[in-house]
Amino acid sequence: MATKSTEKHTPMMQQYLRLKSENPDILLFYRMGDFYELFYDDAKRASQLLEISLTKRGSSAGEPIPMAGIPYHAVEGYLAKLVQQGESVAICEQIGDPATSKGPVERKVVRIVTPGTVTDEALLPERFDNLIAAIYHHKGQFGYATLDITSGRFKVSEPNTEEAMLAELQRTAPTELLFSEDFEPVHLLEKRNGNRRRPVWEFELDTAKQQLNNQFGTRDLVGFGVERAEFGLCAAGCLIQYVKDTQRTTLPHIRSIIMDHQDDSVILDAATRRNLEITQNLAGGFNHTLAEILDHTSTAMGSRLLKRWLHQPVRTHDVLNQRLDAIGELKESGLFADIAPQLKNIGDVERILARLALRSARPRDLARLRNALQQLPELSQTTQEFQQNHLLTLAASAQPIDSICELLERAIKENPPVVIRDGGVLADGYNEELDQWRDLANGATQYLEKLEQEERERHDIDTLKVGYNNVHGFYIQISKGQSHKAPAHYVRRQTLKNAERYIIPELKEHEDKVLNSKSKALAIEKRLWEELFDQLLPHLEQLQSMANAISELDVLSNLAERADTLNYCRPVLTKETGINIEGGRHPVVEQVMSDPFIANPIKLNPDRKMLIITGPNMGGKSTYMRQTALIALMAHVGCYVPADSAEIGTLDRIFTRIGASDDLASGRSTFMVEMTETANILHNATKHSLVLMDEIGRGTSTYDGLSLAWASAEWLATKINAMTLFATHYFELTELPNLFTGLANVHLDAVEHGDEIAFMHAVQEGAANKSYGLAVASLAGVPKSVIKKAKQKLQHLESGQVSVPATSTTVKEEHQLSLIPEISEVEEALANVNPDDLTPRQALEELYRLKALL
């Protein structure tokens, strides 16, 4: 927004412009009565983003001032829309008293809502993490920090390549990303909402260390194991400063920072996460993903933890076996069936505690926290049956916290209002002084009944009543027929059709006392509300530990239920290289198919590291490859897998080159996308990687594609020695196992019945003998006349004769293409000619002979 002189504006608009100048890059919601108003460019932008009316208010330099507004009671819905579009909003409230203000009511920005720092329940995706991140770049190296403000989970890492950095961005999917003004690889930031440019100095190392030490109350960062991660700390320092600035309060729930070591995880690049459809399908939705099948958790915080596990598979066998042991006990004992319903009543304690830490928790947050704590005794009874060490550790952290539960039971009403603003939150009996003022504020009904009875008897007026309304306050009402009996000290206040209303000094005095008591009771209640936070915050760490334990117990119990319901087996994790699966199934496809899923084995080891997979389209090659990767992934998450048995060696990375589409925005063709992903695999795969390669080379000419596919397969097999599944339609590649050790052919079979085809979906040893392309084309609805013509062409090709209408030349061709084309007779004859040995006449004769060979 351009700078605007405030001299020619009203005092209110001058105040607005001053506040806007302090928040120039974000929308300012300026409270005016029952509305939040936006002006100038903010109003234009908000009207577009929120689809609200753009109006005008006053003028500036002779031009009307654009204005847009939203009702204050509906603000959460509008904030949610803006946050989803990556926008940030400064909320400016009236903090002064309009009755005592001279000039505009005092206002100030009380909070800044940004996509990565929201904690309000209405603005957050319930079952997905909401992260804010900062990225730092220096001479090809990266520092990366992420924070989940709703849990206090603060992590830092140092990806050493652009490819690794892109994979981290894909894995963490931050809703807000901070970057320096001099950040160079800006292509990493493309196609993202919520990017925030920050000053260079916020990323300085010394500033970062000071910010972090101030946050944690430490002298140095050695105890967190991040002292030497200087690039990561630069990002983390900027991040913590930004969050403090937006929250306008302390952050007591952020007590540590964790170094995310890539060596501890199985690395999945961006293409692999997309192709395996872990938490998002290829269309961008949640349906038919691995998470949809596995996530039957009882709590939202458990659901978020499971997705973190799925996106960051672990290489450490101790951690994995600990999870598998726990799942095994819950499954075999059947305790998962008891735990799930108990956890359903606990709710999202993790995010409630974040709002408690930020002192933004609402009355119903504390009511839900109370309800959660009330479930712990029953859960504790169930967990007494645990025997496995890790389950016992979780049970110890999820024990009842009686003191806090009792405090909340005494303090909060059973069904409190949404906000503290109008009171009515704290329970009767919690505070004696509050109860006294409330009794008075509620009108002291007993006093009024006594006054009514006395006045009625004293003046012999049986229609006399004492009443109250918001306009006239307390009054005495007498019917028209008896109004002549009203004593002289009754002062008429209102005349109705059938009655007169009066006021007397005693009633006026009581009214003043009652009205004063309401404001007094509200002030006391708000003070006690803040004191309640002070009583709860010292227990924050214990409460967070409880929430973390319940989250993990929820995930383990859920995975036990999934293993039991879906007939999964426990994988055996080995240190040796290899994958040996019997009766493997695709976890998603088997659930969405109406027909029984055909289970298949796979065996990869040092003597059999690459499978060349052939077979018809729709035969199941891609499903077979993906299920192998998903089973390996699930084993490294520490959960049971869809197979009869599975032995999984340690993996360092999983790569997939499956399918492709044009990247029009970047000007990259399908083939370019395919080759970029292939290059990434050939550069970064190791002998401990699992590589899935599907139809390499099909986006270019036959010989180019075949050559690239052959060379890629040979490189993976001989130079990298990665465990590889290589699906292809180039049947020449089935010769590779005859040329190199450690390779084998397998195929997915099909059976033809006349013009129909039946896909067997069973993996067989050896190469396929047909591709069944015409049968698949017929299934797809290609016109019969086209299929008929194709069959004729196929017969000509297979017989070695192809008629080319443009010439009379007959092309002879083998049934299978060769990798290196054979030299033609003309080329061979020409190669044998030495021009220096020929006379002019001989040269002319040789030329005629060569022409005759064409």
Curated annotation (Swiss-Prot):
A Gene Ontology cellular-component term: cytosol
Keyword presence, Disulfide bond: no
GO biological process: mismatch repair
GO MF terms, alphabetically ordered: ATP binding; ATP-dependent DNA damage sensor activity; damaged DNA binding; mismatched DNA binding
Domain of life according to the entry: Bacteria
Residue numbers binding ATP: 615-622
CDD domains named among the record's database cross-references: ABC_MutS1
Keyword flag ATP-binding: yes
Keywords, ordered alphabetically: ATP-binding, DNA damage, DNA repair, DNA-binding, Nucleotide-binding
SMART domains cross-referenced by the UniProt entry: MUTSac (SM00534), MUTSd (SM00533)
Pfam families (UniProt xref): MutS_I, MutS_II, MutS_III, MutS_IV, MutS_V
InterPro entries registered for this protein in UniProt: DNA_mismatch_repair_MutS, DNA_mismatch_repair_MutS-lik_N, DNA_mismatch_repair_MutS/MSH, DNA_mismatch_repair_MutS_C, DNA_mismatch_repair_MutS_clamp, DNA_mismatch_repair_MutS_core, DNA_mismatch_repair_MutS_N, DNA_mismatch_repair_MutS_sf
Protein task: This protein is involved in the repair of mismatches in DNA. It is possible that it carries out the mismatch recognition step. This protein has a weak ATPase activity.
HAMAP family: MutS
Protein family according to the UniProt entry: Belongs to the DNA mismatch repair MutS family.
Name under which the protein is recorded: DNA mismatch repair protein MutS
Organism, as annotated: Aliivibrio fischeri (strain MJ11)
Gene: mutS
